[in-house]
Amino acid sequence: MAKKSLIQRERKRQKLEQKYHLIRRSSKKKIRSKVYPLSLSEKTKMREKLQSLPRNSAPTRLHRRCFLTGRPRANYRDFGLSGHILREMVYACLLPGATRSSW
């Protein structure tokens, strides 16, 4: 089980990312726009605006975690579980449609 403080920190990052998502996306779009190109000074202002946003609001700072244990590694996106929890649940027949491999 992951420390509760790490799980809370991750939730805080998710909330910040959702809060600043539109601002970050629109300013990046304006910087990369080829239809309405910005001057160098305008691009610099937009980059400064991006840099002024909280660091934890960047989507690259997010980590997927197992929703049962909070483990940050070996997560399966389809289930939202870490590998060893997924394996235990499959063996206990708690995941419909998932079977042990045998050949």
UniProtKB/Swiss-Prot annotation:
Q: What biological process terms from GO does the record include? A: translation
GO MF annotations in UniProt: rRNA binding; structural constituent of ribosome
Going by the entry's taxonomy, the superkingdom of the source organism is recorded as Eukaryota
Chief subcellular site? plastid
InterPro entries recorded: Ribosomal_uS14 (IPR001209), Ribosomal_uS14_bac/plastid (IPR023036), Ribosomal_uS14_CS (IPR018271)
One GO CC term on file: chloroplast
Gene3D superfamilies named in the record:
1.10.287.1480
Query: Has UniProt tagged this entry with the keyword DNA damage?
Result: no
Which SUPFAM superfamilies does the record match to this protein? Glucocorticoid receptor-like (DNA-binding domain)
Which keywords belong to this entry? Answer: Chloroplast, Plastid, Ribonucleoprotein, Ribosomal protein, RNA-binding, rRNA-binding
Pfam families in the record:
Ribosomal_S14
User: Which compartments does it reside in?
Assistant: Plastid, Chloroplast
Q: Which family does it belong to?
A: Belongs to the universal ribosomal protein uS14 family.
Function, in words:
Binds 16S rRNA, required for the assembly of 30S particles.
Instruction: Supply the NCBIfam families for this chain.
Output: PRK08881.1 (NF006477)
Subunit info here reads: Part of the 30S ribosomal subunit.
Q: What protein name is recorded for this chain?
A: Small ribosomal subunit protein uS14c
The gene for this chain is: rps14
